Each structure stands twice: as C-alpha cells, then as structure tokens.
C-alpha cells in the first residue's frame, strides 16, 4: 500500500549510540560516537551518518539552548524503508543519545532514552547493559502487549494500525497545538499536490513532530518523495532539489537556506504560525470536502482522542473512497484499476479535475498498487479506511460497491471453481474480500440506523431476551408489510393492544436463528437487502430483538424499555397467575393510543375471547392492558385476565380494603351494540371527557398497598371554583353555581350509564319504547324513577335481589335497543376485581359487570350508595344519540367521607341511585334528616345541548305517584335558590308536549314545593 515502514524487522533496534563533540584545543570538531550497543555493530556508514543527524543545527548558534530534548530523524535504506533515529539531547546540546530502529515507537523509545540517560548520568553501568540487552534480544511483541524490561522500565507496544489520538500520540499533539487549522489545511492541500514543502521551527521536538504529524494525516497514503524530518547542515543543498520533498529545518539554518534559489516552495514557519505558498492548492480542492474538514477540526470535541485524525480520514475517504468502483475483476485475470472509470464516476467538475490530477500523484499510485498487490496475492486487507468508506457511503460508493460485489457474483462459477481448486489466489482473495466487506457494510449501516432510531424515539430496544426465539427471515418481513409494521419500537406500541397475529409463525427461509440470536451475515452468494433497524436486528446478534418476537414465544411478561423497568417489575405477580389454555394466542404487544381505529365492519370480526384481544366485536377504545398493578390479594387472578384496571367503577372503602366477593353479589349483564368512537361524543368532548378507557391511566402502586387506586389524566385547564373542592362549602350565588355546572359538563362520561337489566338471554334485547304511547308498567317504573324521595331509596337497607325473576327495579331504568342489527356479543370478564365472572352467561353475551350494590348483601357500613351505576365502555355499543341521566351524589357520610376530594368529577366513582334531571343544568340535592347535609356531593351534569334521557309524560291518573311524601312539609333549604332559577328551567324541545297540569306538577316536583 506504499507504506515505507518495514513490516518484520529482526530486532527492536539496530544500534544505540552516544554522540558528543570532542574538545581538542578548545575548539569543537566533528561529533564522534562515544559509546555504542551492541559493540560489534559494524556498519560504519550508518554510524557516520548518525553523528551528523544527531546535531542538525549550528552548535555555536544563539538558539542552541532552545533546541529541546527529544527529536527524530529518518534514514532511508536501499529498499526505501525508513529507519527512525530517536534522539535525546543533553543539557547544553553537547551530547546526544540515539536509538536507531525500524519501529515507529516514538513514545516508547523516548521513554527508554530518558532511562538510559539517567543510568549514564548516575554511572549505573549494570542497569544500562541489562536494559539494552533485554531490549535488543526481545522478540517483536504484538501491538497492545505490555513489556517489562526491568523493575522500573516497562512499556506497552503501540498499535500503528490505529488512528493517532491526542494526547497519546506525541507527534500529532504537538502538531495540532503548534499549527492553526487554516495552516494545517493549506499544508494538507500542498501535500496532496506533492509540492516542495519546508517547515521551519526553533525547537527540534516541535519541528519533527510537525513533519511526522502532517505526514500521518495522509493515511492511508504515504509521502513517497524526499522525507527528512530534520535536515543536518551538510545536506542543505537538498532544499534546491527539483523533486517534491517534505523537509524540516532548524531555525538556525534558515538564514542560509533563504539565500538559495527556492522556486515554488511552500514554507511553513511554526514559530510565527505563517505559511508562504505560490499555489492555490486549497482553493482547487472540492469545496464541500474542505468545508466539512474545517468544521470538524474547529470543533472542541475533536481536540482529544482520534477526532483530528478521523477528520482527515473522512476527507481522504471523500476524495479517494470510490476507488473500488474502478477495480476491474475478470475471472482468471489479475485485478486491475481503471483510471477513466475512477475519474468519470463524479459529476462535479472540481472533483473530476482533482481526481484527474490525483491519478498522476505518486502517493495515489503507490496506494492503488499496494491494494492490487494485496488482492492479487491472496492476502486481502481490512483497515480503518475501508471501514470509513463502508460507513460513510462517500460519493455513492456504497451503491457502486455493491454493484461491484454483484459483478463478483456474476462470475461466481469461475470464482468458486478457482477457490475450490486453489489455482488462482487472486480469485480466492476476491471472494473473501467481498464477503468481509459485505459483513462490514451491513454492520456499519445498521449501527448508523440504530443511532438514528434512538435519537428519534428516545429509547433503545430491549437489551436482553429471556427465552429462545425463532426470528422471521428478513425476506419474509420484506414481503409481508404487516410484519414490518408490527415490528416498531416498543415506545410506539406501549399502551395499545396489538391486532391478532397468526398463531403459527412463518418458518424462516434460512436458518438464521440459533438460541434466539441472529448470527447470519449477508454473503455474496446470498445478498440481503438493507433494512432499517426497525425491520431487522444486528447481524452480530448483540442488539435486542423486537418486542413482538418475544411476545410470540412467551406468555410471560413482555420486556419493556429501560425507562419502563419500574412499571414492568410490578407485572410479575399478575402474569404469574395466568391460567390459560394451550389453544389461546399469545398476548399481542401494545400500540400507541394514536393508532386506535374503530373496525370498519364489526360483523366480519369473530367474537373469540382470549386475553390477547378483550373486545374483538367492539371498538378498540374498550381495550386495555394492565400495566402498573402489583396485586397481592386473592383477587389478582381476575385482574390477570387482561381487563383494563381503569374501568373499575368503585373504590372499596378504606375501612374494608379486602371485602370478600360474597358480599358484593353477582355481576349483571347489559346488551351492547357496536358503534364508532365518535357517535356519542361531541367534538368538544373528545378531548375533555375523561373516559375510563382513553383518558384514564393507572398510577403504579407502592409495594405495600393492597387495593388498587385509580388515577385520572387531568383534562385541559378549566376554571373551577374552590368551593367544589370542599364538601361542606357554601353554595354561593346562582351565577357561580350555574357556571360551575357548565364547567363540569365535560366530566360526564358517555360510557357511565346507571342501572342494570335482566340477565335472561331473551330479555336482554327486549325493547322499551320511549314513544308517546308507552304506559302501564313501564311508565310506572320510569315514573317511580323520577321520584327522588322514594321510600325504597331513602331507606338505609335494601332488599336482596331475587334469584329467579328478571324484573328491573324502579332504580334501574331499562334502555331501548332495537333487536335488529345487533351483532353477536361475546363474554367479557368483570371490570371489578372483587366480583367473580358470570359462569352461567351464554358464550355470546357481553358481560359488563357492576358491583352488586342493592341486589347483593352489602354490609351496613356501605349503605345504599353502593347501588352504583353500571359502567359501560363508551365504544362498546351503539346507544341513541342522547344525553345520559344525571347522577346525583347523595350525602353518604359513611362512604363519601372516605372518598378523596379530587374524585368529584371522576366518572369512575359510585354515585348512588340515579335521579333524572331536567333539560337545564341543575343539581338536585336531597333533603335528609341527617345533620350532615353539608357533606352533599355535586353530581354529574348533563350537557345543555342534548335532550335528557326522559320517558314521555305519564297520564293524568298517574300524577299522584309524583307527589313527594312526608319530607315535603319540611322546608327545603334550597327552595329560595331554586325559585330564583326556576325561569331558567324549561323542558327540552325534543320532548313531546305535555299538558299544563303535568308541567305544573313537574315544576312542583322539581322545586320540592
């Protein structure tokens, strides 16, 4: 590759000498060798040359005290290989210690010279001999190996294949400190054009460091012309040589050099940091490459490490990285390089002009010849330059490089035959070369895409896997866009149930999965297309597999990103109690809530119940995944079925956190009809209504808590009077009360419907017409519902629900659902973890459970307030487009005294038996004999634009049923308030007109008169 470094020297160093000026008669003569090792070294020509290079300055110069201590010169042997002379000047520059070696170990030999100088000063001859003998007999160690020469002398072998770094590399460090960026760029351009270059400095260590450092920036190319890091006085005529050179001159010799005829010489003065050049080499280079290089060098982050060297390496790759596209590969023929193809590849005029000149440069020719020699000899090569080309894709080299590999594959028959017969080592090298670079290219591109994906999503893939998995082949994923879509980062999936997967995983076309890790790498025989990191894992197998692959093979907890670790740890008890059949599908990974869409045709989706999809027949808004509960009580098995914990209609009182399910009675069923997600939501309510399945989240519980606690995602900021946050606050004026009720309209969840219906399969779909002709028993039940002062409601205890009759109570209004068009529902586990699943329900009926309330046998401490409304998923059925009944929270000291104050707008808490409100916004507090009337809670209010859920007015004969009972003689404390607001209360125009007597009766009932 044009390197002038000898690859396998026989010894670590050739000779060690101590050179000094002998004093004869008070005058200085030529320097002489005072001592040498080994003593039998017989190359007198080398020894004479060493003595002159050890003092490359005028000894009687005034600047002799500034020469510094360590410097390096270079001697070229007959094979054009460089031998480095590492020197250390003594104080006063009268003597010099020098080691001549083929190894460019600058820091190592500088350290050894200091030790040897110390031994010489202290006259420790034994240590001096022992150190030199050990070093001279030492076999050349491998890079990175620590070598111990004596008790106090050891070193680590440097790796010359790596990029030089700051401050480890002494030459690059001094060069970067001494020369500014602009002069470095000018010097770099002059070296690319192979100019005659002189570098001047008054300090020898800095001078030689600048020469070696600037030449190292040409990697992977090497300066092929005259190379003299420090020029001795007897060779000053080299400055007039017509060929290109790179020479360093001490400042004491520069005055004589100025008197020479120097034509077209680039001079860099390091002391003054100035550069003189008659050429416009920097301006003639492609501007985009130079601008990028300049920006990288000026960044503070590149001042340490290999940033400076890598910046120049990127520039070299941008200039010459497409050389591989010009390689001509023919079967049974040596690989050659086509200069025309190399130049014509680029469209830019500046780049074409530069490359046309570059093909004539000696350093580029030596580089190409070195690469071709390695390929044709069968050795091959792989270095940081090739890695940079693969990673950077400079000048479209990635695409053309794979075209080159395709060309290799087209002649695969001849190549494979050649490899098998081992007749042509060049073809065998091409095969290995192409395979190695295919591996390198895939790895580097995926690493770049991985970094880009992490930057965009803010989350890395899961770091480890728990079970062996069968990874689908990339070709299967490329053909199946659904698989590719499903393999998104877990940050996108989290919070949404995935659509069902096929139960049988497609078998990979190639055996690329072993113990759950992808180990196959694209080869020239079987190319694999580039895929983003979301579609494929790393070829090395050290990146994590996608979460979907883990879900397919395991019914255990799904691994989550590191930031979710705390929440996922809480799932161990939930999933450990799963009791599923083998036929059930694995739980699909969750998606984000933005991707929720209602099914277009719900009849096409089969109603199969498993814990992967909870509601195949309804909208996806009713789905949920338990993500943050760790249950330690016996009811965790009900929660582990995958039901959304956000849909629990009630919170058990703190006095009895673990009531047995026997106290809560049986669960009840309600017919559900499919509807789209927007059928019962106004546009203004879609963002503000905290529905249990969309707006609610679950707060992760502390480990010590036993009962679940619900959290509500706060709606957009709404002005809310402070009196709503206290139970016993004063009412305030009428306008404030009305404004408060308007502000609370958004809190009414359309999915919160009170009441229950019979469980019989025949009565589930029986309609109850709300038309004007409805009367009789249905009217009696609905009219009884309108009476908030019913004795059954005001009683402290409620009768148990009969086991056999399927008759609705006066407090459980039936809902009219037309029997036609109702799809076949399917069972669903109860939403309340404390209520067992309904065992006798038909398999095609949806179960939306509710606390048993008045129909069970609640403890006396619970009171009638546990007759909570049935909580429905807002997207689970098609209710008529009408408002829901107002739920008035009554004064239940034994229950509401324990409820948190922040839950007064939550649709999740029990609100007692319902009371139907008029069309205007109004809250009907009920006067009770209890002295705690001040603790009355505010109920949920209706929207004024929606008609109330009211039946038609009853006949005149039924009017006495609306008359209030005994409590009407007691003066209502809110009578004055309601009298003032009576003019605002009017029946909704959507209702059928009723007689005046009914109107008066209704107003009389509303005002408790």
From Swiss-Prot:
The gene is DENND1A. It is a peripheral membrane protein. Residues 500-509 have a biased composition (Basic residues). Phosphorylated on serine and/or threonine in an Akt-dependent manner. Phosphorylation probably regulates the guanine nucleotide exchange factor (GEF) activity, possibly by disrupting an intramolecular interaction between the DENN domain and the C-terminus of the protein, thereby relieving the autoinhibition. Residues 453-564, 648-714, 796-831, 928-1009 are annotated as: Disordered. It is linked to Genetic variants in DENND1A may play a role in susceptibility to polycystic ovary syndrome (PCOS), the most common endocrine disease among premenopausal women. PCOS is a complex disorder characterized by infertility, hirsutism, obesity, various menstrual disturbances, and enlarged ovaries studded with atretic follicles. It holds the Pfam family uDENN. Residues 986-997 have a biased composition (Low complexity). Keywords: Cell membrane, Cell projection, Cytoplasmic vesicle, Guanine-nucleotide releasing factor, Lipid-binding, Membrane, Phosphoprotein, Protein transport, Synapse, Transport. GO terms for molecular function: guanyl-nucleotide exchange factor activity; phosphatidylinositol phosphate binding; phosphatidylinositol-3-phosphate binding. Residues 820-831, 945-957 have a biased composition (Pro residues). InterPro entries: cDENN_dom, dDENN_dom, DENN_C, DENND1A/B/C, Tripartite_DENN, uDENN_dom. PANTHER family: DENN DOMAIN-CONTAINING (PTHR13196), DENN DOMAIN-CONTAINING PROTEIN 1A (PTHR13196:SF22). Residues 13-145 form the uDENN domain. This is DENN domain-containing protein 1A. Residues 477-489, 972-983, 999-1009 have a biased composition (Basic and acidic residues). Residues 162-298 form the cDENN domain.
